[in-house]
A protein has these predicted regions:
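Rossmann-fold NAD(P)H-dependent dehydrogenase/reductase core
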Residues: 2-158
């Protein structure tokens, strides 16, 4: 990594309460213990539990839980505004990890957008665009993807 990344900073991980997002959060705290880690999750209760697990594993105290529901573009906008005014160190990493797969009936969020598309794609697209002004030089944005929308897999997505 370049030396610019070694200064204090903030990493934001969406869906950091379980799975790949949690593993990513663990690794970030291991490699950059001086950074502030933002767990951006839909469920505050689950995010607080994840933060407690990270802290009990020696991750340090600079872990922040923030509410983010990617199914709601209003929630994404609120989150971006909160990041801008929170007084966090410069954002050096944004990991867009949160995602869902609904195999049952097709569902829609506000505005008539299919739920998995809203959460897995549009929410993260808006989030990344809104946070561009808050990113430090040499910051990284990582998008985690899946085969959820692969039409050959017939997973229930229209």
């Amino acid at each position: 990594m370049c030396s610019a990344v070694n200064r204090d900073g903030t990493a934001i991980v969406t869906g950091a309460n379980v799975g790949l997002g949690y593993a990513c959060a663990e690794r970030i705290k291991e490699l950059r213990p001086d950074w502030t880690l933002v767990l951006a999750c839909r469920s505050r209760e689950k995010a607080e539990a994840a933060a407690a697990r990270l802290k009990s594993g020696g991750a340090g105290s600079n872990i922040v839980v923030m509410d983010l529901d990617l199914a709601s573009l209003d929630s994404v906008r609120r989150f971006a505004k909160e990041v801008a005014v929170a007084g966090l160190p410069p954002v050096r990493a944004l990991v867009c990890n949160a995602g869902i797969q609904i195999i049952s009936e097709t569902s829609y969020v506000g505005g008539g957008i299919e739920t998995t598309f809203a959460i897995n794609h549009l929410g993260h697209f808006l989030l990344a665009n809104l946070l561009l002004r808050d990113l430090a030089p040499a910051a990284r944005i990582v998008f985690v993807a899946s085969g959820t929308h692969d039409p050959k897999k017939k997973t229930g997505i229209p």
